[in-house]
């Protein structure tokens, strides 16, 4: 179990429970961003107007029926190309296991703040794993309306169970099994996306680290009720640095995607996993697969919890750059070569060099 002093910002959970009517100014978004924030995301999620996040049925992803398999592969490729994010259904991970993961995470955040503080991270010392309220320096310098728990969950030899919650008792077994099954699903998805680029099916997995070096990390995001949701964000606009990101949530809306120059609210689809294409695959595919800008909204009425699992390449071993097969005279490389660590630094400390991977924020 890791202990450390809490940082200067109070836990958002404590702010929410204090009965305040207005949020501290450190949580208020910049003026130019406020005009796009919806105060009632719960009502917005019920709207059927505008574009809708695609739902991909994976039931026939490995089917012996060639027609069904090809149809599934094409739909997955199209969603990765057009949106870069999708709902996955019939993904093969048992509903009972997902329910256990959600229950364990919810129970952890229901513990008294004092108990959770025993798992607090120490960002000043470079230790981001554990319980916290701000993962890293973000783009705006503003605080986000969330607390979180962040840790490496796979492969087993790279995890540190000493920092995992021991309460509730099912947290470690449920999370470990979920990470293992999600890692296997990632292999299947990467195979389909490789084929979609005209590559051998194992190519993308190899390029992001393979069985030994691809790191799987989980961030449980806890978004308390917010008295002024029209002024705050749970997670500011960003793209994921990962190869793939898989997200569960407690069926409370909040995720928005920046699609066709406007913010689109993701629906709550039962028994689905949301999957994002991350920057890593966008770079390797030379932009053919999209890493979409997205953000998390909060609301007055309900606590929102999400479980984001990031599949990431090793920081220094691999140089990320467009694969030769994705480049031509007509489509020259859109991204400069960088290690994953260099890409992380590039993202965290703002992009000021006019790269083609720069994305709008609002």
Curated annotation (Swiss-Prot):
GO terms for molecular function: L-ascorbic acid binding; leucocyanidin oxygenase activity; metal ion binding. Pathway: Pigment biosynthesis; anthocyanin biosynthesis. Keywords: Dioxygenase, Flavonoid biosynthesis, Iron, Metal-binding, Oxidoreductase, Vitamin C. Residues 1-23 are annotated as: Disordered. Binds 1 Fe cation per subunit. Residues 214-313 form the Fe2OG dioxygenase domain. Signal peptide: none annotated. Its cofactor is Fe cation; L-ascorbate. Gene3D superfamilies: B-lactam Antibiotic, Isopenicillin N Synthase, Chain (2.60.120.330). This is Leucoanthocyanidin dioxygenase. It comes from Perilla frutescens.
